[in-house]
Amino acid sequence: MSSVVVVGSQWGDEGKGKITDFLSQNAEVIARYQGGDNAGHTIAFDGKTYKLRLIPSGIFYSDKISVIGNGVVLNPKSLVTELKYLHDNGVSTDNLRISNRAHVILPYHIVLDGLQEAAKKDNKIGTTNKGIGPAYMDKAARVGIRVADLLEKDTFEEKLRTNLEEKNRLFEKMYGHEPLKFEDIFEEYYEYGQELKDYVTDTSVILNDALDSGKRVLFEGAQGVMLDIDQGTYPFVTSSNPVAGGVTIGSGVGPAKIDKVVGACKAYTSRVGDGPFPTELHDEIGDHIREVGHEYGTVTKRPRRIGWFDSVVMRHSKRVSGLTNLCLNCVDVLTGLDEIKICTAYELNGEKIYHYPASLKELSACKPVYETLPGWKEDITNCKTLEDLPENARNYIHRIQDLVGVKVSTFSVGPDREQTNVLDNVWAHI
């Protein structure tokens, strides 16, 4: 039995898809455990780039099982579209498994998401308007519709009718929005369920059976630790738990079966949407990193906010998610800069602090304390080992490792699978 969890250790978009794809080569089962189609992941290999939102990165390996766990909120329309996208590109989805306990995103969730965000005016949290939050709200309120319900026509009809009556009253009285039609949603989404039914099963059984039989299982998170609803920059967070602890709830696998937690991070920091960002750059360097790193949202296409590497954030991620290894991505993006800064602490009310405050008021008053390192000019996109890197690039990686207190197991010097370089095999010591 061996398992590895890949989490984003910043604010998402850290290259989890690439690292998951890379680690999938030695896994037999790959599983998503939370989130929805609000976050995309990009995988590049053999000269082609694929962008997915719901289906795990392991789908590109025909000999591996890919699982969408019960902690995911699933938009059937998006999933059917994604399946067609893969089929059109010659990718088989025969090994996909979908949890019958996953909750379903329906049109009223998406409408409500947009209405709630618009009503906040200057206090927007930067939702992607994919219905994620409202779907998790229904789940917590025990009125959600699960995949198992979607497949049972009478059950789906009854629950949809009840929920839609309530949502339509809310739309009309609270927001002045026209009601949604039951017939339009019911027929369309029941049909989606029929298209998906052959993939649906109890994925907790599949995952536990795999682990108990000695297979390697890789768990893939969405978003990042700093967007976790409990441990992130609340309320500027997602509605689920991307931290490694979310695996046990979102997949039905007990905590004793988790062996390693790999934190994916960039050699700098990025963020999409509103919320605190202590090391954010508002200058030409930030613009340069954004363009060189193609820092635009996979799903939203919004330009990402850019900042220096923040070791305070990373130590927080290490603590709350139990990071055992780091995968450092996008080192090549920093090539050409004369100097590179790393945030080592914050200054708050004249004192240095080394933890990430919960209070938004305190966060807004924090000033990053920087350490400046010399940059490098050499092209590193073909480097395969640490020794191949320029001395300044090596020193930068070592300094990140020292400040975070977690060993760097891989570093990447480009978007392709072949540009990911292994320093320590995560699977080897389990």
Swiss-Prot record:
Q: Which residues bind substrate?
A: T298, V299, T300, K301, R302, P303, R304
In this protein, the active site sits at D13 (proton acceptor), H41 (proton donor)
Coiled coil (UniProt feature): none
Describe the reaction catalysed, as an equation.
IMP + L-aspartate + GTP = N(6)-(1,2-dicarboxyethyl)-AMP + GDP + phosphate + 2 H(+)
Which InterPro entries does the entry link to?
A: Adenylosuccin_syn_GTP-bd, Adenylosuccin_syn_Lys_AS, Adenylosuccinate_synth_dom1, Adenylosuccinate_synth_dom2, Adenylosuccinate_synth_dom3, Adenylosuccinate_synthetase, P-loop_NTPase
**Cofactor binding note:** Binds 1 Mg(2+) ion per subunit.
Q: What name is this protein filed under?
A: Adenylosuccinate synthetase
Taxonomy-wise, where does this protein's organism fall, top ranks first? Answer: Bacteria, Bacillati, Bacillota, Bacilli, Lactobacillales
